[in-house]
Design a protein with these regions (language model features):
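Extracellular and secretory-pathway beta-repeat/beta-biased strand scaffolds
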Residues: 2-317
Length: 317
């Protein structure tokens, strides 16, 4: 098999330039199954794509904000996708429009903030590793002009009933943020965000506050009315579930739901670990918000204690 490097530059209103390279690569290597993010269209901003080899894709963004529509966004085991952004506060929106869910089984990295949107669901597999400054993974969408203007309001079609699930390891840089928002959200892996903000929320509409104390605010019309379907095609038993471990020492962790009665057995199931201990003299905070119509089941560990002598610790609500 031939090995080579190629680059393509895409700007606003560009053609789907990377697809030309992918077609050429598959022609030269007919036995190869390509699974990296494919067929991008840049809707806003300046972005280039560097296909390093058969398992590595680099996305280089030179504008502070950019929007890319992808036909598919998958990363298989032993594959890697990296987003290089101008700064830690720069943001990339990657929206999947091809009608299939996203499976992240390899490595996803960025020095900035990524917003991954797929109405058909997102799964981070058990061998996946994510290292970013910030990550928003959601089945809801945002208007392009709202994103560019800084109005981070997301909404979802009534028929969407899919999930965002993490079974791997996600590391958020110190002081960064992570938000999973979908009709169903689950963490059975590891999430680390020291001094950061973590939100796992079930809802249809929400607003992001990237710089305030409350990362995710669920809309008043955000209530889940229908069964939510997991990646295996069966209904989920909880709208927000944490059976893994979440570490946000010195930061905030929020688990929230807006749901109608009898949609699931329990709206929140917390049988894992949430740790938001005091760090660098900053108290941690853990909030579980189940609404008025659902059962919040806690059989795991919530820890917002002080780590050092004399520290009182944060609070749990």
């Amino acid at each position: 098999m031939s090995h080579y490097k190629n680059k393509f530059l895409c700007r606003r209103s560009s053609v789907k330039c990377l697809s030309l390279f992918l077609s050429l690569y598959l022609t030269l290597a007919p036995g190869f199954a390509f699974a990296l993010p494919s067929d991008p269209t840049v809707r806003n901003g300046s972005v280039s794509f560097n296909q390093v080899d058969s398992k590595t894709l680099n996305i280089i963004q030179s504008s502070d904000k950019a929007i890319i529509d992808w036909n598919s966004f998958n990363i298989q085991k032993n594959e890697a996708t990296h987003f290089q952004l101008p700064s830690a506060n720069s943001i990339n929106v990657s929206r999947v429009t091809g009608g299939v869910s996203s499976s992240i089984f390899g490595t996803l990295t960025s020095n900035g903030k990524l917003m991954l949107i797929n109405p058909n669901g997102i799964l981070f597999g058990k061998d996946s590793r994510v290292d970013v400054n910030g990550l928003v993974a959601t089945t809801s969408d945002i208007n392009n002009s709202d994103f560019i203007s800084g109005n981070y309001h997301f909404s979802i079609s009534p028929e969407i009933n899919r999930t965002v699930i993490n079974r791997g390891t996600i590391n958020i840089k110190q002081g960064g943020l992570l938000a999973f928002v979908a009709p169903g959200v689950e963490n059975s892996g590891i999430i680390n965000a020291k001094l950061g903000q973590i939100s796992l929320a079930s809802g249809k509409t929400f607003t992001l506050d990237l710089y305030g104390d409350k990362l995710v605010s669920l809309g008043i019309d955000s209530k889940i009315l229908n069964q939510v379907i997991g990646p295996d095609g069966t209904p989920v038993s909880s709208l927000v579930a944490n059976g893994g471990s979440i570490h946000a020492n010195g930061g905030n962790v929020f688990l929230g739901v807006k749901a109608a009665r009898n949609v699931v057995d329990q709206v929140i199931n917390m049988d894992g670990l949430i740790e938001a201990q005091t760090a660098f003299k900053k108290d941690g905070k853990i909030v579980l918000l189940g609404g008025d119509e659902g059962l919040v089941k806690i059989t795991g560990t919530l820890d917002a204690s002080g780590k050092e002598s004399g520290q009182l610790g944060g609070n749990i609500q």
